[in-house]
């Protein structure tokens, strides 16, 4: 017998253990006539007449195609509503993610991320219209942030207690030669005495139709510099020296290097310094040859390419070499004197700190520390090189670095999250290895979501001072450069022994707007949260203190910024 599910199943009290099936209107052979539900429910249950337990499973069976017709019509309507609802929900979630508000939709991390603003950095201004909004947000999340601080502070304390600024073991010259046989065969031990830059003549065996830049890797992999090399190619044959039926080209290395650091104003310094008539830079502002290209690295995550030979690097200085050659070949003493004052510079901001390639090429490490560093090779060829370093409060440097290199979902929350993750990774390394081993650890550096290690200036500077004299360095602060450009540039001129500028030249150099400033869309994001700033200040404090001690200048402790 068939009965309607809405009105025909009744259970007696537990003690009776019986199930009675009676329709209120009596049994009906056709459930369409059920007086209670009027046939609106087409799902039928077939219940045996046997005694059943309360949790017994009822068997569901279809009772002919006519019974499913209404159900399918009902299901199609619901199904359309469900699909439409899913589409709306997907669009809402996508808008949250794209707007950077996805933190509320995701499972929270071990630390809570909220927001309230810190003071904007010295060089990067903030949009005033966003201040009230950031202030309101900070009030909401302040308690959550402060709850996280003790846990993060334990990580920082763990790192701090393991910091040791040890003296590195210097490699022998013969060991360096074994690593770079070709480079040592190309660059001579002595340079021309009447040139301020390290230059020498080498024989050119090609004909006047030979393209000297045909295989240059910088030309092959970078289209924007091809026009520069086209001009060099056309003028090449006219700048050769000829003697005894042979042809010679002048080769030069930089007289000085701007070696670091990233997001510390090196581009601005480069742009101003290149306005001086006695300064000639490489054809490319940042060749990154010493740290990356000579190992075949363009982007480390993309793997290794063919190594750029030293000849490709030397080609970048041909424009300056042509002018120096003119001076050396000039007939008048005045012309010789003018051209011989030219100095060559190079401004790769990776030179000071980036030694990530060593793990791929040097297998004789000591306790995880690299056996050779970039400065070892530069010193082997240029023991008298001049080195300029521009530094910045490492806390602000890191945030500027994050805003510049992060591609999407940038926010103060995301930055805070990445900082805490990087600190945890750095601590894990410090538990097993020395400070130097962790700073130069390629695996760690690639794993950290922000480049925490770049701000450890004291570690890098001490390693550079292990091979170069302190007098060969000019260490500048971006904060000082921003407040008094003229004073900073005069210090650079004096350090490089450059001649004075005319009033017009100096005005052009000092009044030009800052280069490579923060992008408007990044300024609109506002500053990092104060608790993030506090965490980073705690982390960098011992490194800044050591730097200030080495330089005998408390300004490099960044206590008041």
Curated annotation (Swiss-Prot):
SUPFAM superfamilies: P-loop containing nucleoside triphosphate hydrolases. Its cofactor is a divalent metal cation; glutathione. Glycans are attached at residue 364. Residues 102-561 are lumenal. Keywords: Disulfide bond, Glycoprotein, Golgi apparatus, Membrane, Signal-anchor, Transferase, Transmembrane, Transmembrane helix. Residues 1-80 are cytoplasmic. Disulfide bonds: none annotated. It catalyses: dermatan 4'-sulfate + n 3'-phosphoadenylyl sulfate = dermatan 4',6'-bissulfate + n adenosine 3',5'-bisphosphate + n H(+); chondroitin 4'-sulfate + n 3'-phosphoadenylyl sulfate = chondroitin 4',6'-bissulfate + n adenosine 3',5'-bisphosphate + n H(+). Expressed in B-cell-enriched tissues but not in fetal or adult thymus. Expressed in fetal and adult spleen, lymph node, tonsil, bone marrow and peripheral leukocytes. Not expressed in T-cells. In pro-B, pre-B, and mature B-cell lines, it colocalizes with RAG1. Belongs to the sulfotransferase 1 family. It also transfers sulfate to a unique non-reducing terminal sequence, GalNAc(4SO4)-GlcA(2SO4)-GalNAc(6SO4), to yield a highly sulfated structure similar to the structure found in thrombomodulin chondroitin sulfate. This is Carbohydrate sulfotransferase 15. The gene is CHST15.
């Amino acid at each position: 017998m068939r009965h309607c599910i809405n009105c025909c199943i009744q259970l007696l009290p537990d003690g009776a253990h019986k199930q009675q099936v009676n329709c209120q209107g009596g049994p009906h052979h056709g459930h369409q006539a059920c007086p209670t539900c009027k046939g609106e429910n087409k799902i039928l249950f077939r219940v045996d007449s046997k005694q059943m337990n309360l949790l017994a499973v009822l068997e569901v069976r279809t009772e002919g195609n006519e019974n499913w017709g209404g159900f399918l019509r009902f299901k199609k309507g619901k199904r359309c509503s469900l699909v439409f609802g899913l589409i709306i929900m997907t669009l809402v979630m996508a808008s949250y993610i794209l707007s950077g508000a996805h933190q509320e939709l995701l499972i929270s991390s071990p630390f809570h991320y909220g927001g309230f603003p810190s003071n904007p950095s010295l060089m990067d201004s903030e949009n005033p219209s966003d201040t009230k909004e950031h202030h309101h947000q900070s009030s909401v999340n302040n308690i959550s942030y402060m709850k996280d601080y003790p846990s993060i502070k334990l990580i920082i304390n763990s790192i701090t207690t393991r910091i040791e600024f040890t003296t590195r073991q210097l490699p022998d010259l013969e060991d360096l030669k074994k690593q770079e046989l070709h480079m040592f065969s190309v660059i001579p031990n002595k340079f021309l005495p009447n040139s301020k830059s390290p230059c020498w003549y080498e024989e050119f065996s090609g004909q006047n139709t030979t393209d000297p830049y045909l295989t240059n890797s910088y030309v092959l992999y970078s289209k924007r510099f091809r026009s520069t090399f086209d001009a060099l190619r056309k003028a090449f044959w006219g700048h050769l020296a000829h003697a005894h039926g042979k042809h010679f080209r002048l080769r030069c290395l930089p007289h000085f290097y701007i070696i670091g650091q990233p997001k510390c104003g090196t581009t601005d310094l480069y742009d101003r310094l290149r306005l001086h008539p006695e300064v000639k830079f490489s054809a490319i502002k940042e060749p990154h040859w010493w740290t990356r290209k000579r190992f075949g690295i363009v982007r480390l995550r993309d793997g290794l390419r063919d190594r750029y030979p030293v000849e490709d690097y030397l080609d970048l200085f041909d424009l300056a070499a042509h002018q120096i050659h003119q001076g050396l070949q000039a007939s008048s003493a005045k012309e010789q004197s003018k051209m011989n004052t030219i100095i060559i510079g190079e401004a790769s901001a990776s030179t000071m700190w980036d030694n990530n390639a060593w793990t791929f090429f040097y297998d004789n490490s000591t306790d995880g520390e690299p056996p050779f560093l970039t400065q070892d090779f530069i010193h082997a060829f240029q023991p008298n090189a001049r080195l300029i370093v521009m530094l910045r409060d490492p806390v602000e440097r890191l945030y500027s670095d994050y805003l510049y290199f992060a591609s999407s979902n940038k926010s103060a929350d995301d930055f805070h999250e990445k900082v805490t993750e990087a600190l945890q990774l750095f601590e894990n390394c410090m538990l097993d290895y020395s400070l130097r081993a962790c700073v130069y650890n390629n695996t760690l550096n690639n794993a950290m979501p922000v480049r925490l290690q770049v701000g450890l200036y004291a570690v890098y500077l001490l390693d550079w001072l292990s091979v170069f004299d302190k007098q060969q360095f000019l260490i500048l602060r971006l904060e000082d450069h921003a407040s008094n450009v003229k004073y900073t540039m005069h210090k650079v001129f004096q350090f490089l022994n450059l001649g004075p500028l005319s009033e017009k030249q100096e005005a052009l150099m000092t009044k030009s707007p800052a280069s490579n400033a923060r992008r408007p869309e990044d300024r609109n994001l506002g500053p990092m949260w104060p608790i993030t700033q506090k965490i980073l200040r705690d982390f960098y404090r011992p490194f800044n203190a050591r730097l200030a001690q080495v330089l005998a200048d408390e300004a490099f402790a960044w206590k008041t910024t």
